[in-house]
């Protein structure tokens, strides 16, 4: 699939030494669900692994803009997450501590600071919140195009208008894929086809 997931997989496989990586897209890059995504980039996660992955993604987008000369449309305008209960605030504090351990910039907020940062927000029933100044948004199409170009720079071949008709199996192992353009022999397949996955048998 030629969305953000597929291009990211292709880029990272090539980056970490995999050879002969091929990305097949049924239509054009970003023509699936990626095109509809909001592109929000928040670093605060429920676990340290998710937080690290989100920070990595943000840093990667900035790095690949320089590498490829293309824009992801990244705007780091910050994000506030608020809590209206003590339990929710405790969860935000836990996540904020985890984020700080991963070198993510985060500020714990009281009601007054929330009002200062976002004056139109009614804060009467709030306990507090957290502010992530480096969070923001990017253009999902831009991110995909940046990842695709970076992948190509590492030797990945990308074929658009090449829908996969079926995954070929021999002796209970994947041995290739059949596309509209012909057969490709391979040992491994990464399915990044979103809601079209069921069509591949």
Language-model region placement:
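Glycine-rich Rossmann-fold phosphate-binding loop(s) that bind the pyrophosphate
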Residues: 1-3, 26, 193
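N-terminal Rossmann-fold NAD(P) dinucleotide-binding loop
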Residues: 6-7
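Gly/Ala-rich phosphate-binding loop of Rossmann-like dinucleotide-binding domains
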Residues: 10, 14, 150
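Glycine-rich FAD pyrophosphate-binding loop
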Residues: 14-35
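Short loop/edge segments at beta-strand edges and connector loops
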Residues: 25, 110, 160-162
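Dinucleotide-binding Rossmann-like beta1-alpha1 core, especially the glycine-rich loop
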Residues: 38-117
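A short, glycine/Asx- and small/polar-enriched loop/turn
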Residues: 87-90, 118-126, 168-175, 184
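Helical element adjacent to the flavin cofactor pocket in flavoenzyme catalytic cores
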Residues: 130-188, 192-199
């Amino acid at each position: 699939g030629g969305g953000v997931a597929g291009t990211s997989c292709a880029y990272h496989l090539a980056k970490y030494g995999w050879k002969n990586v091929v990305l097949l897209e049924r239509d054009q890059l970003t023509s699936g669900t990626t095109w509809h995504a909001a592109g929000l980039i928040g670093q605060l996660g429920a676990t340290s692994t998710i937080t690290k992955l989100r920070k990595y993604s943000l840093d990667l987008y900035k790095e690949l803009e320089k590498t490829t000369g293309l824009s992801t449309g990244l705007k780091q305008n910050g994000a506030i997450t608020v809590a209206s209960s003590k339990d929710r605030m405790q969860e935000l504090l836990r996540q904020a501590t985890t984020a700080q351990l991963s070198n993510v910039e985060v500020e714990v907020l009281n009601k007054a600071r929330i009002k200062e940062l976002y004056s139109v927000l009614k804060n009467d029933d709030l306990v507090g919140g957290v502010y992530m100044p480096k969070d923001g948004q990017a253009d999902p199409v831009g991110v995909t195009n940046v990842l695709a170009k970076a992948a190509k720079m590492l030797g990945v071949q990308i074929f658009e208008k090449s829908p996969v008709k079926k995954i070929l199996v021999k002796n209970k192992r994947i041995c290739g894929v059949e596309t509209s353009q012909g057969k490709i022999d391979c040992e491994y397949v990464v399915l990044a086809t979103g809601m079209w996955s069921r069509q591949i048998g």
